[in-house]
């Protein structure tokens, strides 16, 4: 049944390409890993609007970091949704790497845009701090009186530059006066804002025998997993919006406002959406759902990863699986650990 669902899914891909940020596909294309040495490849990246193409050619040395940023964003999405009905599945042989699932203005679309935008900002910022590009480096603006017992040192990561790159590149195609562009711009910025919110000081001690007479400190990004956890919380509390039309000098413009006035209005840190998500229980070529048949579920969980919810009430199958594992490990002085190899039997539960 899973293969049938995959076939149905592929049938709907052609409908997805028109409104897709298909440049995300550079995250899974090995041919883009050498962008820094082959600028002509900018023209081969699919789906670039003219502004993105100019940016790529002007700043080609940071384009590998842009590709890496989208890649880590996708990987983090798959981690955060690993136990949900929609698990951020990608299709490697398609330009629409998530399929039609992102055609709708749902919570899932909001999260993917936010995490991809954050990934680009994060990867570019980290690359600059590591000295991988000549056009950027460390942030030298965090100077002044730092505090008693420590001073500025090391390399503060320039998240403002990374966010600028993400904003100029990722938002370049979101300039239409419609609600979806407004939603994408907002969620892209929420992704970038998450990094700024989570920046923290890292310090290193200096002195005789580690006495820490003086500390040098610098601003650092968190692990990207922390950003993913933060944005997943924003996904769970995303604000539902409604579309309003206004007539301006340039014509009709669509904007978003909160659907419910008794809830707090979303800030620039929050995710927004205006269309309901499908239930993702069955394969559906129109929504891009793979369904949940044959997905591994947790028989002891009452949460969304549990067999009751993940399998959508269809029940589950159970099979036994033998695995080789290290066991009876003993530490020997000095200094190694010797283990035996054991065969252990596990129950594996999959959705019907």
From Swiss-Prot:
Keyword Lipoprotein: yes
GO cellular component terms listed in the entry, alphabetical order: cytosol; endoplasmic reticulum; extracellular space; nuclear outer membrane; plasma membrane
Family assignment from sequence similarity: Belongs to the Wnt family.
Gene Ontology BP, a term: determination of dorsal identity
Modifications made to the protein after synthesis: Palmitoleoylation is required for efficient binding to frizzled receptors. Depalmitoleoylation leads to inhibit the Wnt signaling pathway.
Taxonomic source organism: Gallus gallus
Annotated glycosylation sites: 87, 92, 298
Molecular function (Gene Ontology), one example: frizzled binding
Disulfide bonds: 77-88, 128-136, 138-155, 203-217, 205-212, 281-312, 297-307, 311-351, 327-342, 329-339, 334-335
Leader sequence segment: 1-18
Lipid moiety-binding residues (O-palmitoleoyl serine): 209
Name the UniProt record assigns to this protein: Protein Wnt-3a
Tissue: Expressed in cornea. Isoform 1 is expressed in the primitive streak, dorsal neural tube, proximal otic vesicle, the apical ectodermal ridge and the epithelium of feather buds.
Keywords associated with the record: Cytoplasm, Developmental protein, Disulfide bond, Extracellular matrix, Glycoprotein, Lipoprotein, Secreted, Signal, Wnt signaling pathway
Keyword NADP: no
């Amino acid at each position: 049944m899973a293969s049938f669902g995959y076939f149905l899914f592929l049938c709907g891909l052609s409908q997805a390409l028109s409104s897709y940020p298909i440049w995300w596909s550079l995250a899974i294309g090995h041919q883009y890993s050498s962008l820094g040495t082959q600028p002509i490849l900018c023209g081969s990246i699919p789906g670039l609007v003219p502004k993105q193409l100019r940016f790529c050619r002007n700043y080609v040395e940071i384009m590998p970091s842009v590709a890496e940023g989208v890649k880590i964003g996708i990987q983090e999405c798959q981690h955060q949704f690993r136990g949900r009905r929609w698990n951020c599945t990608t299709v490697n042989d398609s330009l629409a790497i998530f399929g039609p699932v992102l055609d709708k203005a749902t919570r899932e679309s909001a999260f993917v845009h936010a995490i991809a935008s954050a990934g680009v900002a994060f990867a570019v910022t980290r690359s600059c701090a590591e000295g991988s590009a000549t056009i950027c480096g460390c942030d030298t603006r965090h100077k002044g009186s730092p505090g008693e017992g420590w001073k500025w040192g090391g390399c503060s990561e320039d998240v403002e530059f990374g966010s600028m790159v993400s904003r100029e590149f990722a938002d370049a195609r979101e300039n239409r006066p419609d609600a979806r562009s407004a939603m994408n711009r907002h969620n892209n910025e929420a992704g970038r804002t998450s990094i700024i919110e989570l920046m923290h000081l890292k310090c290193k001690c200096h002195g005789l025998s580690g006495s820490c007479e003086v500390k040098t400190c610098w601003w650092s990004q968190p692990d990207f997993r922390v950003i993913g956890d933060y944005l997943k919380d924003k996904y769970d509390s995303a604000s539902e919006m409604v579309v309003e039309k206004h007539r301006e000098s340039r014509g009709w413009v669509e904007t978003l406002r909160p659907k419910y006035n008794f809830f707090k209005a979303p800030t620039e840190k929050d995710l927004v959406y205006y269309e309901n998500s499908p239930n993702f229980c069955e394969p559906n070529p129109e929504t891009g759902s793979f369904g949940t048949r044959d997905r591994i579920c947790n028989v002891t969980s009452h949460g969304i990863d549990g067999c009751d919810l993940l399998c959508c009430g269809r029940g589950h199958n159970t099979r036994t699986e033998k695995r080789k594992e290290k066991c009876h490990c003993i530490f020997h002085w000095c200094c190694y650990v010797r283990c035996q190899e054991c065969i252990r039997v596990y129950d594996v539960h999959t959705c019907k």
